[in-house]
Regions:
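Short, surface-exposed glycine/acidic/tryptophan-bearing loops
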Residues: 21-47, 84-85
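Surface-exposed patches in mature extracellular/periplasmic domains of secreted proteins
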Residues: 18-21, 73-85, 106, 122
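Long, amphipathic alpha-helical surface segments
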Residues: 1-17, 25-26, 34-36, 51, ...
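Structural recognition of the beta-strand scaffold that forms the well-ordered cores
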Residues: 29-31, 88-91, 118-119
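Short, structured coil/loop segments at alpha-helix boundaries
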Residues: 1-3, 41, 82
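Alpha-helical segment that forms one wall of the substrate-binding/catalytic cleft
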Residues: 43-75, 83-101
């Protein structure tokens, strides 16, 4: 999978924000859709506080790596999927996170069966 293409797609979908904001779930988020957790040094930051461009890049690099690892956990043979499927599924995993994305049992089964037509219908 072309990681640069994945990064471009996710950055385009998410946007890039130096200031902490509330996502649609009213959780503090920063950078390129990075959900702030208690493990992050940004944890004490409030909405409107800012981080550097360098920190955004660090968070994004880490989040992309986690997303790809998560896809390899969720799907039997993720690396053998066609690139369009990899990009789509990785983007979904990035947006939703592994715990939520793992609940899409039919979608996961279709992907593992390489049933791309039914997968496309399921996720649209």
């Amino acid at each position: 999978m072309n990681i640069d293409k994945l990064r471009e797609e996710i950055a385009s979908d998410e946007g890039r924000r130096n200031a902490v904001y509330l996502c649609s779930l009213q959780k503090r988020t920063v950078g390129i859709g990075h959900l702030i957790t208690a493990d992050d040094p940004e944890w004490p930051m409030e909405v409107g506080d800012t981080i550097s461009d360098e920190r955004i890049d660090e968070l994004f690099d880490s989040d992309i790596a986690v997303t790809i690892d998560d896809c390899r956990i969720i799907f039997d043979d993720f690396d053998a999927f066609p690139e369009p499927a990899q990009l789509c599924l990785a983007n979904m995993c990035y947006q939703l996170g592994r715990p939520t994305f793992s609940k899409f049992k039919r979608s996961i089964a279709y992907a593992n069966d390489h049933n791309w037509g039914d997968l496309a219908e399921e996720i649209l």
